[in-house]
Amino acid sequence: MSAETAPINLTHHFLIAMPGLEDEAFSRSVIYLCEHSERGALGLIINKPSQLTLEGLLEKVDLALGREDLRGNRVFNGGPVQTDRGFVLHDPMVIEGAPDDESAYASTMTIPGGLEMTTSKDVLEALSDGAGPKRLLVTLGYASWGEGQLESELAENAWLTVGADANVIFDTPVDDRYDRALGLLGLQRWMISPEAGRA
């Protein structure tokens, strides 16, 4: 990155894979960026469900799902890094009266823009008790980029970026999330090509 280039921060943005991105893990992916800084980036793929259900995941940690509204929900392939580790992206859950709007869960990252990502088992225990966040997306694994790596991929036209909309994550059918994310840019799939930006 040159001294004249201002650093960009894409936290709480979507990365939308361009058609030319052939990496199996990321092809036609929409990734929600939980964190982006000069040190790198971390995100969760929001449109690639696995075969594992939320009930199945809870059973693996000796819990039962206590929420009928989540029955049948899929766990998502969040990315190729630490695929045995769970991440829960959700609306904020705060403890009323706690200092600095402390999160209700032990290991939670508050994401500027209004969402939280929790990695501790207590959020799963809350789901077992019939409580927990109203809207959530559970993944196994995550996507990450080292220093300057994402910026290089952006310069190579591997991704489109747009400010995230939580409704795309939580309220849009999985098969429509790619097109809805493109729609945030005023685009449709036919309008983008693998060679975008190249003469």
Curated annotation (Swiss-Prot):
Gene3D superfamilies: VC0467-like. InterPro entries: AlgH-like (IPR003774). Transmembrane segments: none annotated. Pfam families: DUF179. Signal peptide: none annotated. GO terms for cellular component: cytosol. NCBIfam families: PRK00228.1-1. Belongs to the UPF0301 (AlgH) family. HAMAP family: UPF0301 (MF_00758). This is UPF0301 protein Daci_1578. It comes from Delftia acidovorans (strain DSM 14801 / SPH-1).
